[in-house]
Amino acid sequence: TSYGNGVHCNKSKCWIDVSELETYKAGTVSNPKDILWSLKE
């Protein structure tokens, strides 16, 4: 599921695809890896 701004969720995990972030496209983000985190219930 996509929440916009590069944020996606699948079951209990969400991640940010930095390639979709405007700041990344603008070259202000240096780390090309996705940012992962778990959803808090």
Curated annotation (Swiss-Prot):
Superkingdom of the organism of origin: Bacteria
UniProt cross-references to Pfam families, sorted A to Z: Bacteriocin_II
Upper taxonomic lineage: Bacteria, Bacillati, Bacillota, Bacilli, Lactobacillales
Similarity remark: Belongs to the bacteriocin class IIA/YGNGV family.
Keywords: Antibiotic, Antimicrobial, Bacteriocin, Disulfide bond, Secreted
Database matches in InterPro entries: Bacteriocin_IIa, Bacteriocin_IIa_CS, Bacteriocin_IIa_dom_sf
Purpose of the protein: Bacteriocin active against S.aureus, S.typhi, B.thuringiensis, Klebsiella sp., E.coli KL16 and E.coli Gj137.
Protein name as it appears in the record: Bacteriocin
Organism this protein belongs to: Lactococcus sp
